[in-house]
């Protein structure tokens, strides 16, 4: 329990330690972040030649603001709820949070209609940053009966990059999976069902299936 409390305190200390990026443009009026060179959802490849995946950051570790990719995929926006900028009423995010480009969990399969969510372990990142990550596994979850799985990844160049599986991560950083599970089970103030953690083989199948749904959805729109 002491490790868990300490972890969250460290998150708050680094809450505003953001890194500048010339490619990222912020419009305070629209609470929107864009990259002038690419569409976050459609223009970024999923897989790299070394087996890592590309992840787009939506929410930096430690933040309480709820940023999310818009429906066009070209901007990450601070969500509105009842015309109020959305913030979570809980401790800040324990990891960086983002999505895998060119993926979709459609409503037909009981998905939420969004790209696949990712938790990125490593240093605090910035909104709109594209990061190469190694996949360790997946936290299987349901949010109000919808599939809400989270891919567990590590930033390749970080301390956590030494891990190659969930089992490795538990040895490298004892208590970290418990922290993540406790946080996601409670941050909304309503019951989220944590089902299980899955290994890499099942996780990659989940990602590839989500890419298939994304491509099928593109075909329907054309």
Residues covered by each model-derived region:
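Hydrophobic N-terminal alpha-helices or hydrophobic patches in metabolic proteins across all domains
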Residues: 22-222
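Classical Sec-dependent N-terminal signal peptides that target proteins to the secretory pathway
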Residues: 1-21
């Amino acid at each position: 329990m002491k490790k868990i409390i300490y972890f969250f305190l460290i998150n708050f200390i680094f809450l505003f330690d953001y890194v500048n990026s010339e490619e990222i443009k912020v419009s305070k009026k629209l609470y929107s972040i864009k990259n002038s060179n690419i569409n976050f959802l459609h223009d970024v490849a999923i897989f790299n030649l070394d087996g890592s995946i590309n992840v787009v950051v939506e929410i930096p570790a430690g933040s309480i603001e709820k940023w999310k990719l818009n429906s066009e995929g070209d901007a990450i926006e601070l969500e509105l709820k009842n015309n109020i900028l959305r913030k979570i009423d809980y401790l800040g995010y324990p990891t960086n949070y983002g999505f895998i480009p060119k993926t979709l969990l459609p409503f037909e399969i009981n998905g939420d209609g969004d790209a696949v969510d990712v938790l990125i372990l490593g240093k605090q990142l910035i909104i709109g940053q594209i990061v190469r990550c190694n996949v360790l596994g997946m936290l299987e979850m349901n949010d109000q009966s919808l599939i809400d799985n989270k891919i567990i990844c590590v930033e390749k160049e970080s301390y956590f990059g030494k891990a190659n599986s969930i089992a490795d991560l538990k040895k490298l950083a004892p208590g970290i999976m418990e922290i993540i599970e406790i946080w996601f089970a409670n941050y909304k103030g309503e019951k989220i069902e944590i089902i299980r953690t899955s290994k890499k083989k099942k996780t990659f199948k989940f990602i590839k299936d989500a890419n298939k749904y994304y491509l099928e959805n593109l075909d329907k729109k054309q």
